[in-house]
Amino acid sequence: MLFRSHLNRNKRSVALDLKHADGMEALRRLIAKADVMVWNVRPAAMARLGLSYDDVKKINPKIIYCGLYGFGQDGRYKDKPAYDTIIQGASGMAALHHRSTGEPRYVPMVVADKVVGMTAVQMIVMALYRREKTGEGSSIGIPMFENMVKFVLEEHMYLTTFDPPLGGTGDPRLLDPQTKPIPTKDGYICISANTNAQAFGMFDAIDRPELKTDPRLVSVQARFANVSYYLEVRNAAFASKTTAEWLKLLEAHDVPAMPYHTLESVQEDPHLQDAGFFLTKDHPTEGKIREMRLPNVWSCGTRKEWSAAPKLGQQSVEILREAGFDDAAITRMIADGATIDGQLKR
C-alpha cells in the first residue's frame, strides 16, 4: 500500500514468525532491550502467544507495553475484531454524514486508525515521563471503539451532555448541510466567520452592511440560534466573483478564508511550495518518489534526512545480529521460516 511509504520512513523492519521457537526467542531478546512494545491484535491472542503484560514484564520490568485493539476489555465486545471502517460506523462517525445528507458514509481516510495511533503516542510519552520519575514500566490499553466514541461525541453529545438531557444530539452548526465549501464564480471558497468582527467584516465584504443590524445575525448567540439562516445568507453571496477576488476582499476585511483545494491542487499550494513541504527523493528500489516534509518544528534541533520505508524484513539480518544471533543461526532461521531476509529477491 502506497501510504506506507509515507508512514514507515525512518523505520527498520524485522519479520518474525512467533509460532516458531527461534522467532519467539528473537522477539524476547528484542523486548529485553526495548523501551516500548506496541502491538495491535486482540489481547487474547497476545495471551495465547505468552506475550501478556505479565509475561513481558518478566523479561523487561521497565518496558512500556502498549496495546491497540478494537474494544475495551470490560465490555461484551472485548473479543471482537475491529478495523477502521467498522469503528467509524459503530462510533457514530458515519452517522454525522447521515445527519447532513441523509445517507451514512465513512470518512474516506483511515481516520479511526490515525486518531487511535496519535492517542497511543500521547499515552506512551506520558508513560515514558512517568518511568523517568518513578523507574517503573507500565501497561497501556488503547481501545479503538471507546476512543472514537469520545472523539465523535466531544462535539456531538451536545445537549444530551446534561442529565436529564436539555435537547438532542449533534452540533447544529457542524451538521447543517450548508456547512461546506461555498460555490464561487469559478470554484469554491472556505470561510469561517465566527466572531462578531469576522461576521461583520464578511457582511461588509459581500456588500450587505445592513445584515450587521439584523436581529438574527447581530451577535454570536443570535447567529448560533439562527444558524441555517446565517449559512443561507452567507452561501448565497459568493457566486458573483471568482475565488481569487473573494480571497483578496475577505483578507482586506480580516475574515478567515482559504481556497478550496482538490487532492491535486493542494500539492501546488504556494505556501507549501514556499515551505518546501513536498520533496522528491530517490527510493532504493522504487525510483523517484514524492514525500512530505515533517511539518512540525522545534528549537532543539533541525530536521534530519529520512530513510525510505523498508520492505518487510528488510533489516531482519542486521537487527538479529544486534540481538546476539550469529550468522549461522540467522541463516538457519531464514531457511526454517522463523524470519525472512527482505533484502533477498523472491
Where are these regions (language model features)?
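An anion/phosphate-binding loop that grips the pyrophosphate of nucleotide cofactors and donors
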Residues: 34
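Short, small-residue-biased leader/transition segments that mark boundaries at the very start
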Residues: 1-2
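Aromatic-enriched alpha-helical interface/lid elements that frame and gate functional surfaces
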Residues: 173, 177-253, 257
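Flexible, small-/acidic-enriched active-site or ligand-binding loops
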Residues: 218, 285-332
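A glycine-rich dinucleotide-binding beta-alpha-beta segment and adjacent secondary-structure elements
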Residues: 252-306
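Active-site-adjacent "lid/gating" segments in soluble enzymes
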Residues: 47-189, 193-194, 201
